A protein has these predicted regions:
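N-terminal small-residue-enriched
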Residues: 1-224
């Protein structure tokens, strides 16, 4: 069914990483294989959404001083208050007008050619209190812990298992649920974000793509 969902902090950010982050890599954008291609300066999310990729976070899994093409890493604001501000750009990226390099060229090892990749991505903290996210929900789902999932490249269509979830009734957590799945499209989900809490958490992991498996971090606060 369709009802409000509150996604927990930390590894909950894997949903945005997979369903949105990959759409903002110029590896996809340059081939027009992303539904977010050619949308710089456009509103692509709700005003509650600010999405950041930061290769400079101290001690984070995805941080290095230089990318695999010899450029310093940086903090890149990808989406700011709903507006698409930047892509993650590797060396071929500047061949496309208006795409400055962002130190995003990455690869697993010398057997792979670098491509644009995420490092440490997070949904920036908002102003809402966690309890306020639940308060107005008559019936919904709390996805406290996310599991694995699948994403269709280009469109951002996704389905993710909820590893630990609970029914929300009249703003209160009730019985646990098993077998719940979150299904949707990344760009549509961006537009439907209602509120973001203040309790940002990050979680480490590995990300696989054309240039192999690389260490990353995903992060977010509680999100409605």
């Amino acid at each position: 069914g369709t009802f409000p969902v509150v996604v927990g902090p930390g590894f909950g950010g894997v949903l945005f990483h997979e369903a949105v982050g990959h759409l903002l890599e110029t590896t996809s954008v340059a081939r027009k294989a992303s539904v977010l291609a050619d949308k710089l300066g456009e509103v692509v999310a709700s005003p509650a959404v600010t999405y950041i990729d930061d290769g400079t976070l101290p001690h984070a899994w995805g941080s290095t001083e230089m990318d695999d093409e010899g450029r310093p890493t940086e903090r890149t604001v990808l989406i700011e208050k709903g507006v698409l501000k930047s892509y993650m750009v590797d060396r071929p990226g500047p061949l496309l007008p208006g795409y400055p390099m962002t130190g995003s060229g990455r690869r697993q090892d010398y057997t792979f050619a670098p491509t644009s990749r995420m490092r440490n991505t997070c949904l920036a903290p908002g102003e809402a209190r966690v309890e306020d996210l639940f308060a107005g929900i008559a019936f919904g789902l709390y996805a406290k812990e996310m599991g694995g999932g699948q994403v269709k490249p280009g469109s951002g269509e996704y389905n993710f298992a909820v590893q630990e979830g609970y029914i929300i009734r009249k703003g209160r957590l009730e019985e646990p649920v098993r077998g719940a799945m979150l299904v949707g499209k990344g760009p549509e989900t961006l537009m439907r974000v209602v509120a973001v809490a203040q309790d940002l958490e990050n979680a480490p992991g590995m990300c696989g793509s054309l240039s192999g498996a690389v260490p990353v971090e995903v992060g977010q606060p509680h999100v409605l």
